[in-house]
Amino acid sequence: MIVDLEGGGVERFLKSFPNHKIIATNGCFDILHAGHVAYLETAKEQGDILIVGLNDDDSIKELKGSDRPINCLEDRARVLASLRCVDLVVIFHEKRAHEFIKAVQPDIYVK
């Protein structure tokens, strides 16, 4: 499942999982590779629900330069959401994940 941080989808999703241990992480995940997958699987092992915050294209350009991202937001989100270990992908629009973390209020934040 993919939601935008600004659309209220995080709150609706979390209401479906009371009493579950929520794990959160975030990143650009521009060219997803085996190391990313292992990292996400390890994060998921820490709890019940893994929520991944995903930087939008504009924030990646600010962080990494005008030639990034290589893959567009929609493709990056879809690939992440297809992973068995990922329960929710949340697109956020800032360079840093502060608002994402505040919205999710995870039991554990993995970075």
Feature-to-residue mapping (PLM):
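Nucleotidyltransferase catalytic core that binds NTPs
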Residues: 1-111
